[in-house]
Amino acid sequence: MKYMVLETFRPGCKARVYERFREKGRMLPDGLRYIDSWLEKDGHRCFQLMETDAPELFDQWTAAWSDLVSFEIIPLEERERQD
């Protein structure tokens, strides 16, 4: 299943988020897959498209970042595209 993850950087933590990312990467547990991401123009929120069959893996991943970021994790319904 795919999920949209809204990350909101805690006040004053944006630089620390990127520093940790450079040092440790995304720190995703096996079974949680990053697909793509977009940064809001003001740079305070990031929207990440992710995929997993085990949504409980989000608990492990968010615990590694929760001191710097708050999360909203939204399950997505996949539908057939009609262009």
Predicted regions, residues:
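Conserved short beta-strand edge segments in small beta-sheet-based binding/regulatory domains
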Residues: 67-79
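Short S/T/G/P-rich N-terminal loop/turn motif that feeds into the first structured element of a domain
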Residues: 1-35, 39-45, 53-57, 77-83
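Short, flexible helix/strand-to-coil boundary loops that buttress conserved ligand/catalytic motifs
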Residues: 62
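Short, well-ordered coil/turn elements that cap or connect secondary structure elements
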Residues: 29, 65-68
